[in-house]
Amino acid sequence: MKKKRFSILKAFFFTVVLALVGGAIFFANRTYQAVKKVEAYQTEITEATQKYQMENYEALVKAIILTESKGSGKDLMQSSESAHGEANVIDNPQESINQGVSYLAEMITEAKKQGCDLATAIQAYNFGKDYIAYVKENGGENTVKLAEKYSKTILSPLLGNEEQTQYRYWRVQSVLYNGGYLYHNGGNMFYADIVAMNEKIIQAYEEMFN
């Protein structure tokens, strides 16, 4: 009986390990393919970063592309809203990168001017420029807790979610923080952390394959 129970436990453990390894391989391959798509726009990224004196932020630009579109589609940096005030207007990758880098440069410049950290500028790429002044008034450094407060009490109600309702958002950062939730119309309070993670992925890829 004990042998049988041990065999069942052993088989169960093996199945779990196999599933975990298989899942890790699947996600690693999916990430690798997405990064390859992002890297395919190296020429356009270099041109835009040189144009806006953002050469030191190439990896960050790529991380934003990976975060926003995984290198697929036309509006790679989801730049339509910053350029036109609405989504799905830009339908050209080069235009999207040019506008995205321009907007990111504006956020970085404003964050430096206000004495805030780089993470604030990155989060403002998602929340909008007003977030920078908010961070300045609250210590000058972006945190998920501060971003959550802004999302819940300012951005979300401003865009119509007065009841502060939430929806499911399955990312490592969100699951560990609050079980996996964002506020409707409240942007992504985990944006800066996700971009930071993706920047490390970009850098690791380039060290291995470039």
Specify the residue positions occupied by each region the protein language model found.
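Short, solvent-exposed loop/turn and secondary-structure capping segments
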Residues: 74-77, 135-136
